[in-house]
């Protein structure tokens, strides 16, 4: 869907790769998935170079050209100050306010995925907490645990502003009606993800923030907790991860921040 099916070797330039990376980020692809895509392209371009299909000057990878990000190279998480800027952002349009609030709800609701967000129902709320199981893991063989999220005042305000009337079987937000096929549900989820990302991209540009997407909300939730001193085990459970390694990958940018801060301490003499 990025540039069609027929792509020539000559069209794969540094700029093309950067545009493709941005496209994948907007599609909510993880850093590891993006790395897989680009290593595959690089392998194809390496073979094309060996076969004489492209010249060395046309090869888009390497120092001074496009470099594939390592797993911890991209800073995905925002700071609390940036989140505050987003929460206060207002361009006067209802659409921006709605999608901004949806993004904030994703962040506040343990970095919930859009696929799980659209399926939340009022019956999932018990004693001031939302209970849900991640769609990504609900069909695995491992025993499933509910993710529980305290409903904070900002979350409640978002529900009151944009939610459906409160009935036990009703979806909290007016995205699904419960009559969709699995494919229709997938398409509605994808449409909502793109709509949120489009608005958040505009907000990011206006606020001078590098990149904001639904995926950023999840990374930010994890990193803010880590910065506050929460244990990796707690963060892993809050995210619904099956193992700590996955959580550690999420927190890679935080570890980089810590190394930079500690390195700076060493120079204070």
What are these regions (language model features)?
Residues 1-28:
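Basic/aromatic-enriched alpha-helical hairpins
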Residues 10-11, 55-56, 68-88, 141-152, ...:
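DNA breakage-rejoining catalytic core of tyrosine-based enzymes
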Residues 11, 63-64, 119-161:
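Conserved tyrosine-mediated DNA breakage-rejoining catalytic core shared by Y-recombinases
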Residues 35, 56-114, 118:
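Basic, Lys/Arg- and aromatic-enriched nucleic-acid-binding interface segment
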Residues 77, 134-139, 239-264:
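Catalytic-site neighborhood detector that most strongly recognizes the C-terminal catalytic loop/helix
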Residues 83, 152-209:
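Active-site/catalytic core of tyrosine-dependent DNA strand-transfer enzymes
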Residues 88, 93, 194-237:
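Short, basic (Lys/Arg/His-rich) helix/loop patches that form interaction surfaces
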Residues 124-129, 209-211, 230-249:
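Short, polar N-cap/turn motifs at the start of nucleic acid-interacting alpha helices
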């Amino acid at each position: 869907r990025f540039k069609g099916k027929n792509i020539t070797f000559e069209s794969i330039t540094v700029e093309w790769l950067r545009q493709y990376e941005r496209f994948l980020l907007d599609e909510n692809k993880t850093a590891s998935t993006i790395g897989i895509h680009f290593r595959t392209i690089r392998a194809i371009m390496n073979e094309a170079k060996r076969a004489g299909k492209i010249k060395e000057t046309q090869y888009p990878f390497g120092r001074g050209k496009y470099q594939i990000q390592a797993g911890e190279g991209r800073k995905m998480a925002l700071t609390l100050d940036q989140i505050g800027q987003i929460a206060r952002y207002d361009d006067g349009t209802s659409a921006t306010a709605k999608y901004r609030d949806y993004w904030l709800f994703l962040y506040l609701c343990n970095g919930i995925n859009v696929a799980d967000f659209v399926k939340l129902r009022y019956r999932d709320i018990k004693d001031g907490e939302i209970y849900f199981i991640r769609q990504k893991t609900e069909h695995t063989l491992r025993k499933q645990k509910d993710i529980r999220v305290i409903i904070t005042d900002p979350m409640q305000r978002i529900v009151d502003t944009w939610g459906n009337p409160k009935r036990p079987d009703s979806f909290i937000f007016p995205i699904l009606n419960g009559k969709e096929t699995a494919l229709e549900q997938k398409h509605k989820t994808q449409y909502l993800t793109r709509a949120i990302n489009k608005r958040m991209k505009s907000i990011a540009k206006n606020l001078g923030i590098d990149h904001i997407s639904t995926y950023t909300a999840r990374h930010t939730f994890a990193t803010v907790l880590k910065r506050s001193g929460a244990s990796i085990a707690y963060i892993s459970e809050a995210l619904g991860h099956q193992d700590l390694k996955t959580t550690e990958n999420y927190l890679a940018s935080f570890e980089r921040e810590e190394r930079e801060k500690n390195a700076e301490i060493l120079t204070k003499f």
